[in-house]
């Protein structure tokens, strides 16, 4: 089975084929997800909440992301592996270069950064030096205290236009993928149609090129707050691999996300 690359995902977008992504943090789960056909695995800073028990993602370090990236890398053969760059690990282009290099050396195929216009120089410099970038707009969890909580972004015309403009600028700067989180489906549609690169949604409706969820939500093992955009597939299937297959199938046929998982 051929490895998934950014070119693979671009081809999927051009063909109108929906693809799936999940977070993963260890070799065993990563191997199961990879074996069932998940296209993209993300070592997310969400590990700060679902593994470490923090209230947000801010305490996570680059060393911790690198550790889990090495674990996941050992478990996969096909999936594209993205590593999150944690809070304040890319405040300057120079800092971003150092930390992104560490994550690539740990086994990542790409790094993910949260932010808009202020990141353009960093995205360009990383890309020019051979480090592929996945950008992240909308609800960016590392900015949770700026937003005043985990809230839907881009509902008013001004902010929607800003997010759309930032998406275009990040693509022009060299980003190869874009994640949009917790934005209205209409805005996600506009972004997906405006960009050549693939767009991955989470809480952004069904029109993006791909979908991503946190594995703990898919398997129904999250504690505390359960996001509206998530779905417990283990509850309906009773087995982990079957849950992953159900997620892949529902994304492919357009039944997930449905209106109950979508914001307006």
Curated annotation (Swiss-Prot):
EC id: 2.1.2.11
Needed cofactors: Mg(2+)
Reactions catalysed according to its record: 3-methyl-2-oxobutanoate + (6R)-5,10-methylene-5,6,7,8-tetrahydrofolate + H2O = 2-dehydropantoate + (6S)-5,6,7,8-tetrahydrofolate
Binding site for 3-methyl-2-oxobutanoate: 45-46, 84, 112
Compartmental location: Cytoplasm
Disulfide cross-links: none
Keywords per UniProt: Cytoplasm, Magnesium, Metal-binding, Pantothenate biosynthesis, Transferase
GO biological process, alphabetically ordered: pantothenate biosynthetic process
Pfam families given in the database record: Pantoate_transf (PF02548)
Binding-site positions, Mg(2+): 45, 84, 114
UniProt-listed SUPFAM superfamilies: Phosphoenolpyruvate/pyruvate domain (SSF51621)
Pathway info: Cofactor biosynthesis; (R)-pantothenate biosynthesis; (R)-pantoate from 3-methyl-2-oxobutanoate: step 1/2
Cited InterPro entries: Pantoate_hydroxy_MeTrfase, Pyrv/PenolPyrv_kinase-like_dom, Pyrv_kinase-like_dom_sf
Record bears the keyword Transferase: yes
GO cellular component: cytoplasm
Single GO molecular function: 3-methyl-2-oxobutanoate hydroxymethyltransferase activity
Self-association state and partner proteins as the record states: Homodecamer; pentamer of dimers.
Family membership: Belongs to the PanB family.
Name used for this protein in its record: 3-methyl-2-oxobutanoate hydroxymethyltransferase
Species assigned in the record: Shewanella sp. (strain MR-7)
Recorded name of the encoding gene: panB
């Amino acid at each position: 089975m051929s490895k998934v690359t950014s070119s693979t995902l671009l081809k999927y977008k051009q063909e109108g084929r929906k693809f799936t992504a999940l977070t993963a943090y260890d070799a065993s789960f990563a191997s199961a997800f990879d074996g069932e056909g998940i296209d993209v695995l993300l070592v997310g800073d969400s590990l700060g909440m679902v593994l470490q028990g923090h209230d947000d993602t801010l305490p996570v370090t680059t060393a911790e992301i690198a550790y889990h990236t090495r674990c996941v890398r050992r478990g996969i053969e096909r999936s594209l592996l993205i590593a999150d760059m944690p809070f304040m690990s890319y405040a300057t282009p120079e800092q971003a270069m150092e930390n992104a290099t560490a994550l690539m050396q740990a086994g990542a195929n790409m790094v993910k950064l949260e932010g808009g216009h202020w990141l353009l120089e960093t995205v360009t410099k990383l890309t020019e030096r051979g480090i592929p970038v996945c950008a992240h707009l909308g609800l960016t969890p590392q900015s949770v205290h700026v937003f005043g909580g985990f809230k839907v972004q881009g509902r008013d015309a001004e902010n929607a236009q800003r997010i759309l403009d930032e998406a275009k600028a990040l693509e022009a700067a060299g980003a190869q993928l874009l994640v949009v989180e917790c934005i209205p489906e209409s805005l996600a549609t506009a972004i997906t149609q405006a960009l050549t690169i693939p767009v991955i949604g989470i809480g952004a409706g069904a029109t993006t090129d791909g979908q991503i969820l946190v594995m703990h939500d898919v398997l129904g093992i999250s504690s505390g707050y359960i996001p509206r955009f998530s779905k417990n597939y283990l509850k309906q299937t009773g087995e982990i691999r079957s849950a992953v297959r159900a997620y892949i199938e529902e994304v492919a046929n357009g039944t997930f996300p449905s209106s109950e998982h979508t914001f307006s």
